[in-house]
From Swiss-Prot:
Contains one covalently linked phycocyanobilin chromophore. GO terms for cellular component: phycobilisome; plasma membrane-derived thylakoid membrane. This is Allophycocyanin alpha chain. It is a peripheral membrane protein. The modification N4-methylasparagine is found at residue 71. Belongs to the phycobiliprotein family.
Amino acid sequence: MSIVTKSIVNADAEARYLSPGELDRIKSFVTSGERRVRIAETMTGARERIIKEAGNQLFQKRPDVVSPGGNAYGEEMTATCLRDLDYYLRLITYGIVAGDVTPIEEIGVVGVREMYKSLGTPIEAVAEGVRAMKSVATSLLSGEDAAEAGAYFDYLIGAMS
């Protein structure tokens, strides 16, 4: 839920106008909107590069994943692994645009540990893939933008730990 929606819901629940503090937070949210959109555009435009480089980093760091018997062994399973990374990158861009982790939490984190466990996929490897995406994606952004985006990657990594 965005800061705007949260503020309105809270104020309405108390049958009051928005407080000066709530209005300041909304102003800050609106002011930072252009930056959040720019970050999401950069990451979306570079998504193939981010996924490819992150996948390469993951497979170098975790060769067990692509070795015979590994969850990403073979062309089809490697493609599935990269598809999952793409899915998480997309969720991160949603969170960045929203200025909130709620889209990541509600769409992608609930049940993720159980799902990967049932598939026999080591969640640590998935988290490592997200770390690799963070490294690639933030290298494409300016310092302030990289810090903003990095927080959403960190949230997802933490949720997987």
